[in-house]
Structure formats: C-alpha cells, structure tokens
Amino acid sequence: MAFGKWKVVVGILCGAVAVAGLCARAAPQAGGAPRDLFNGKDLSGWHVDAPALDKDPKARSPFTVRNGLLVSLGTPGGHLITNSAYEDYRLEVEYRFAGKPGNCGVLVHASTPRALYGMFPRSIEVQMEHLNAGDFWCIVEDITVPDMERRRGPKERWGTTGDRLRRIANLNDGAEKPVGEWNTMVIEALDDQIKVWVNGILVNHGYNATADEGQIALQAEGSEVEFRKVRLTPITKLSGDAGPATTP
C-alpha cells in the first residue's frame, strides 16, 4: 500500500450519495503534511447525506458551522462525509457534547452509502457515545480484536448487518472528560489495523479489518456535538500504546 496517497473522489458524483457505486476516484495524489479536514469556516471538502433531505431538500441540514466550530445538530439523522478517500493516516478529532451527553461517531473506511438500515455507509465506526467512546461498530465491514467473545458476545451471533452482534466493546470506559469539556480522539488506520486513543488513553486496537481505505464520516445521531479540530496526517507505522503526540 502506497504511503501518503490521497485518493480523490469526484465531488459531483459523491453528491449523488443515494446511488451506490458512482463515486469514482482520480489518480492518487502525493501528500505528507498534516491536513485540516475542517477549515473552521465552512463545510468545503465534505457533503451531507441525510435521507430526510431526499423528501424535503429545503429542510434543515443536520450539519453546520457555528462560531468557528463544526456542529452536528443530531437531527435529522445522517452523515457528513469527506469528498476524498484516505488510507494510512492518523486522524485527530477534538469534540464535546456541549449540552446533554449523547451519541455520535467517526466512521472510517466508508464506501457504499446507506448500506445499513438505509442510513449508515459501509464502514467501521469508532463510537463517540458518552461513556462508550472507542467502541467499534461493524457496518457491513468487520474487524478483529483480542478476547473477541468477551468484548463482542457469542461467536455464532457475530455479523456486520441487521441484528447481528456488530458492537465490539472498548478497553476503557473511563477515558472521557465530563460533559461540556473537550475530548481528543486519535484514530490511526494503517493497512488492516485501527488503533484508537481518547484523551491519551488507548481504548481500542483492531486488526484484520476488511477495508483499509475509504472516506471519513461524522454522524448526526440524535445529539448535538461540536468539533473544533478534524486533522489528518499520513503515517507509515502505528504509534505505541502510550499514543502519539497530538498537533497544536
């Protein structure tokens, strides 16, 4: 797998998210420096996929920029998806539940839109739900962790769709800060591995992922969440369990 290659998705086609398989990729472009996926001003480089907007395109988008922050309003349900696909990277996300604690997530290796329940793109979700940050949720993709039966449940019920056991519990439920304070989530995705830290604490490490590249998505899943940093840096190796130094 080539290092530092951004695989650019044709933005116009990706806007037609309701039609699976239309997002073409241009030739890979070399890169290496950290890149802010959120510019602090608008949603350039992203597109919204919210099924409710199919029926009423003038309805309120679940994502906006407010006071320099990217805000997931929580409703209507949907996703904010990058126009580009990425591989071999570190993703730094600074977020907080500004009001009531709730649910949200970061989806990595995202591809086919609305692949599950007519809502969720095919991907691996890194959970941000309050008190469960760092869980993996398998969405028509899969990943393996140590001690799988304890953390996922009986093997015969594992799966990636419908009512199968798709959740893989994190390693530590105590990494989050109190509601209203900023959390830092770091996700490293390299080859078939995904490693996650919350506030410097290792909360998950999976391997044998069934995808190793794709788009990145943020969820609107019922709760208002503010983001002040979404930064991506190419990597060639995973950080140790103590975690990487975050960028200012």
Residue ranges and their predicted role:
Residues 1-2, 20, 30:
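Coiled-coil-like amphipathic alpha-helices with heptad-repeat character
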Residues 1-14:
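Bacterial N-terminal signal peptides that target proteins for export
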Residues 5-7, 21-22, 149:
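N-terminal targeting/docking segments
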Residues 15-17, 238-239:
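Alpha-helical transmembrane segments and their juxtamembrane interfaces
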Residues 17-25:
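C-terminal segment of classical bacterial N-terminal signal peptides
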Residues 24-248:
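Carbohydrate-interacting regions of secretory-pathway proteins
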